[in-house]
Design a protein with these regions (language model features):
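Short secondary-structure boundary/capping segments within folded domains
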Residues: 13-17, 98-103
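Generic structural detector for well-ordered beta-strands
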Residues: 24, 34, 100-101, 168-170, ...
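General beta-strand recognition
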Residues: 24, 42, 108, 176-178
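Solvent-exposed, flexible loop/coil segments flanking beta-strands in beta-rich domains
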Residues: 61-98
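Extended extracellular/luminal ectodomain segments enriched in beta-structured repeat modules
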Residues: 101-108, 174
Length: 202
């Protein structure tokens, strides 16, 4: 194989004479294509990595850059800073615990909600999930976790928490997602805390 590539340069673009060809490196060669941090590669065709080696992941405890696949956005409220809940008047009322802002893209959103109640609080139902509307549960039951304790309710006298299903969101512009907690109860008080996390998939 030749040790050089014959090409012409126009306006900073390198073009080979045969535009239908393939750039091939030696099978046992030690030379790699290096791209500096100030440069980028734009591909308009499909990327086909090795089926076994694939795309190498990070080898240390760092984070993906904003806008890159793997980016994580998260927000949490600890039990000591839990927000107060009021007895729900409707099926989809709730309380915003915290929120995150996601830029355009394809995301997986997941998290958990915790309910903290006083010793005498009597619960008949609780729920948690995400929504794009503040202080409102999502009307899609499959995107939330809900519990019903019957007409008699129960008095847990403790803190309990639960995860809600991972939800894919594909958005064309920056959107706020709220972590919502809900409780239907009588007597005494209840508060909600939790975490909402999103990871960019595309």
């Amino acid at each position: 194989m030749a040790s050089s590539i014959n090409a012409s340069t126009t306006a900073g673009v390198v073009t080979t004479a045969d535009t239908s060809g393939v750039l091939a490196l030696q099978t046992a060669g030690t030379t790699a294509i290096a791209i500096s941090a100030s440069q980028a590669v734009t591909l308009t065709g499909a990327i086909t990595p090795s089926q076994t080696a694939g795309i190498v992941g990070t080898t240390t405890n760092n984070n993906a850059n904003a806008g890159s696949v793997g980016e994580v956005v998260s927000s949490s409220v600890a039990v000591g800073s839990a927000v107060s809940l009021t007895t729900a008047a409707g099926a989809f009322t709730g309380k915003t615990i915290t929120s995150i802002s996601l830029t355009a893209g394809d995301w997986d959103v997941f998290g958990s909600v915790g309910i903290n109640m006083a010793a005498t609080t009597n619960f008949t139902a609780s729920a948690g999930g995400i929504n794009t509307v503040a202080d409102t549960l999502n009307s899609l039951y499959e995107e939330e976790t809900r519990f019903s304790y019957g007409a008699g309710g129960f008095v847990p006298n403790n803190v309990f928490s639960f995860a809600f299903p991972t939800t894919r969101v594909s958005i064309a512009s920056t959107t706020t997602y709220y972590l919502i907690g809900y409780a239907s109860f009588t007597i005494s008080t209840a508060t909600a805390f939790g975490r909402i996390t999103a990871r960019r998939m595309r």
